[in-house]
């Protein structure tokens, strides 16, 4: 163990400002707030998985990717739940003992090895979903013939990106020092910021690509609706638009959540370096910025409500088509006239 690690391990007592932050009313409110977010995410994750399983709004490839991402989010949210409960317990039991408030980083191995990989996996889900949309549009025939192979391949790549990021950040890093919560990274993780920048770049690139694919899908669907009488071709175009729109919304929301967390933390660090912001204020604000936790709530919300909306719209369209025109020939003639 080097000198820096030894120094960090010697600082086992929380400062007065940090102690005040950890036992404050604000932190207790934050505990209730984060627990509520996690519990709501559990409910909507279950509803979203049911929606994906029972309805064919999304393609089989997209559904498989989304289900795996939802299951991963459950693990991440559960890790967040456990770390907040243990922190709240210590803040109550050891509120007058600053030297027992903090967690030794080496005692948080279980949490670290779940929280960060699942967080990276959630972030890199945008990579899989974006390429899923690209392949579905530009290699449509191949995509529909090999959906499960494509989904599995993209998930493997997503996992490799996750493992690579985790390896860069944590490999060979001494888990020295003490942290306020077990999901806080050890101080000696020097590449943490660099990997965050890579994640941000990946998400921005995926947003741009997904928006482009959505735009192209909308144009393509309008053209097909005018020129094609094939129900299969028309439905495939409609499915591409619906799925691309949902994925685009999901990626933008996930990016927004993570950027609020990243930008907020960096801004606080910048302000702290320029002015005398106390640890109490710093940790009180940072505790409200777990971006991936919020992103893991947004994903099932988008899936569930988008599925309900699309199902309702589909039923309305079918009802209009079947109620207004009793004769199939008359309906086809009308479609021909409207497409001229």
Curated annotation (Swiss-Prot):
Presence of keyword Iron: no
GO cellular component, one term: membrane
Protein name: Serpentine receptor class alpha-18
Membrane topology qualifier: Multi-pass membrane protein
Family recorded in the similarity comment: Belongs to the nematode receptor-like protein sra family.
Membrane-crossing segments per the record: 29-49, 109-129, 149-169, 198-218, 249-269, 285-305
Pfam families for the chain: 7TM_GPCR_Sra (PF02117)
Gene this protein is translated from: sra-18
Keyword Transmembrane: yes
Source organism of the structure: Caenorhabditis elegans
InterPro entries: 7TM_GPCR_serpentine_rcpt_Sra (IPR000344)
Organismal lineage: Eukaryota, Metazoa, Ecdysozoa, Nematoda, Chromadorea
GO molecular function: G protein-coupled receptor activity
BP terms from Gene Ontology: sensory perception of chemical stimulus
PANTHER family found in the cross-reference section: G-PROTEIN COUPLED RECEPTORS FAMILY 1 PROFILE DOMAIN-CONTAINING PROTEIN-RELATED, SERPENTINE RECEPTOR, CLASS A (ALPHA)-RELATED-RELATED
Subcellular location: Membrane
């Amino acid at each position: 163990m080097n000198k820096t690690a030894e120094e960090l391990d010697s600082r086992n007592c929380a400062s007065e400002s940090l102690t005040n932050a950890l036992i404050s009313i604000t932190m207790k409110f934050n505990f209730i707030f984060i627990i509520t977010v996690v519990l709501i995410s559990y409910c909507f994750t279950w509803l979203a998985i049911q929606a994906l399983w029972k309805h064919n709004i999304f393609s089989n490839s997209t559904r498989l990717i989304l289900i795996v991402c939802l299951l991963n989010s459950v693990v991440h949210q559960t890790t967040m739940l456990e770390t907040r409960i243990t922190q709240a317990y210590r803040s109550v039991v050891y509120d007058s003992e600053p030297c027992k408030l903090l967690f030794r980083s080496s005692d948080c191995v279980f949490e670290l090895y779940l929280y960060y990989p699942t967080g990276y996996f959630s972030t890199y889900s945008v990579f899989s979903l974006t390429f899923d949309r690209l392949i579905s549009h530009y290699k449509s025939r191949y995509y529909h013939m090999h959906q499960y192979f494509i989904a599995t391949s993209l998930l493997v790549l997503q996992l490799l990106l996750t493992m690579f990021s985790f390896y860069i950040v944590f490999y060979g890093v001494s888990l020295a020092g003490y942290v306020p919560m077990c999901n806080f990274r050890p101080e000696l993780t020097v590449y943490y910021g660099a990997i965050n920048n890579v994640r941000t770049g990946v998400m921005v690139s995926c947003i741009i690509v997904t928006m482009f694919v959505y735009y192209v899908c909308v144009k393509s669907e309008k053209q097909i609706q005018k020129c094609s009488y094939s129900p299969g071709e028309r439905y495939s175009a409609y499915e591409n638009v619906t799925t691309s729109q949902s994925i685009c919304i999901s990626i933008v929301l996930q990016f927004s959540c993570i950027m609020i967390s990243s930008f907020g933390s960096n801004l606080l660090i910048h302000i702290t370096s320029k002015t005398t912001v106390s640890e109490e204020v710093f940790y009180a604000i940072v505790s409200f910025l777990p971006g991936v936790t919020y992103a893991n709530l947004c994903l099932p919300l988008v899936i569930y409500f988008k599925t309900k909306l699309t199902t309702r719209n589909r039923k309305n369209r079918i009802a209009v088509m079947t109620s207004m025109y009793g004769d199939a020939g008359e309906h086809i003639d009308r479609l021909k006239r409207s497409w001229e």
